[in-house]
């Protein structure tokens, strides 16, 4: 989302301004960008990502997913071990930022003795407001070439105002917005599948009835 991206770029620019990094570029990944399914592949993939981020900022979103896997077939820990070594080897020209929900990130930091010593500066971002989540929804619609009707937009505002106020279990900020839009698009597809005359405007327009009743 645009708001989160602005925060990342601001942090990057500050490190660049004080000379902590030489290039100032941003490399953003999540678990899928680091972990592979076979022994040895994860270390190699993670090392390549680290190499690509040298001189800049490596941003790892939902970093806790690297250490909360179950069973011996999970290679997230291999990525963490490689990351820690890379941070030590390149500590003079690499900034690594890990992000995620507070409680899960605490578990992540507790999973390896080396993590807390290396990740010892914390920034707590407030949850998105309802209006920010609606803005993210509108932007995501544009990216996927959808539009919200006036009534649909009002329904979205009602939904996110209530959800942000109550913050039910599983509340997930921008991920809620993505899931909400996916369900709205699915509902719209079901609604128009039986229509005889469907033009581009109908295909692109999400109506209030496509949003009413969505549960996350």
Specify the residue positions occupied by each region the protein language model found.
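Conserved C-terminal "switch" segment of AAA+ ATPases
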Residues: 18-21, 104-110, 116, 122-170, ...
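Conserved RecA-like P-loop NTPase ATPase core
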Residues: 8, 29, 46, 61, ...
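Single conserved hydrophobic/aromatic residue that forms the stacking wall/gate
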Residues: 1-11
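Conserved P-loop NTPase "ATPase switch" module shared by AAA+ and STAND
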Residues: 29-30, 53-72
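Canonical AAA+ ATPase core
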Residues: 64-71, 80-126, 131, 143-144, ...
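C-terminal helical "lid" subdomain and adjoining coupling/linker elements of P-loop NTPases
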Residues: 148, 163-216
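Short glycine-rich substrate-engagement loop in P-loop NTPases that contacts/grips substrate
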Residues: 24-53
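Post-Walker A helix-loop "phosphate-sensing" segment adjacent to the P-loop in P-loop NTPases
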Residues: 12-24
